């Protein structure tokens, strides 16, 4: 009986260990980071999907630009608008389905503005404007290059 319990324990352990030992894939980490950043900017308010895509597109443009860090994580943490001023804020974010959907669409190559020069989103005018979106609560946000 004791041997049977040990065998069952080892069998269960062998089934659990491989999944626990596998690290998160880089693509999954990038998806999670992008969804969190999109949600940090748009999750509190019901912005349209186009707005979510534009926010994410700016982040991906920054990663591709020589003016910014080379990784999504570094770009996000370099700007308080995404990670917040409070330590642990960004880590505690749980993106909603719409943020994940926007991240998935962007990582699959979809673009709304389709202009790699667009590196800023702000209510103030910074350079040329590629796209402006209006929300009655937040006003006009411009996506600039």
What are these regions (language model features)?
Residues 1, 17-23:
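Intrinsically disordered, low-complexity Ser/Thr/Pro-rich tracts
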Residues 1-8:
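Bacterial N-terminal signal peptides that target proteins for export
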Residues 24-145:
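Bacterial extracytoplasmic/cell-wall-associated proteins, especially those involved in peptidoglycan
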